[in-house]
A protein has these predicted regions:
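A short, compositionally biased micro-patch
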Residues: 30, 71-72, 97
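Generic structural detector for well-ordered beta-strands
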Residues: 7-11, 38, 67, 93, ...
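Amphipathic alpha-helical segments that line or abut small-molecule/effector binding pockets
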Residues: 15-18, 133, 137
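Glycine-rich portal/gate segments that line the openings of hydrophobic small-molecule binding cavities
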Residues: 38-85, 103, 110, 134-146
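Hydrophobic ligand-binding cavity/cleft-lining segments
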Residues: 1-46
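Beta-strand/loop substructures that line and gate deep hydrophobic ligand-binding cavities in soluble
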Residues: 80-134
Length: 146
């Protein structure tokens, strides 16, 4: 299917935008419903690192693991979900516009497994389409406030 895409111009250099956007410990600061994020193993991100995020769903915390599929700092970063009924593929691109501003684009797509095959088209895609613009604007505000 077609990914859900949100984009904005951030008044910060590409390296700053990339660093903040791709640090899982910052994810709860700008993603609705996310309560925790971290890399395994801890340390600098590299292809194959696991990105573990915990989201509040239906009154319970649910952890999901993704694997880092590509990284080209400060331009591109991507993860692919490897567990759970709904697995996201996320691609982040940061395009420098000037020395002090960048275009940030985040694309998210979903693959359903088991019950997730029903959830993705009925709930998950619609929720992502609703949340992504607000999430990206929250991220923009956070980065620009630093």
């Amino acid at each position: 299917m077609t990914p859900t895409v949100a984009s904005t111009v951030v008044d910060r250099p590409a390296a700053e935008v990339f660093s903040y956007t791709t640090d899982p410990t910052h994810f709860p600061e700008w993603q609705q419903g996310l309560v925790d994020g971290h890399l395994e193993p801890a340390g600098p991100a590299q292809v194959g690192s696991k990105c573990v995020t915990t989201r509040r769903i239906g009154g319970a915390n649910r952890a999901v693991t993704s694997v880092l599929t590509h990284i080209d700092a400060p331009r591109a970063w991507g993860v692919r979900g490897i567990d759970g009924p709904v697995r996201a593929t996320v691609d982040v691109t940061v395009e420098p516009l000037t020395e002090t501003s960048s275009r940030l684009t985040i694309a998210v797509d979903f693959d359903g497994h088991g019950i997730g095959k029903l959830l993705v088209p009925l709930i998950v895609r619609r929720q992502a389409e609703k949340e992504m613009p607000a999430n990206v604007e929250a991220l923009k505000r956070r980065v620009e406030a630093q």
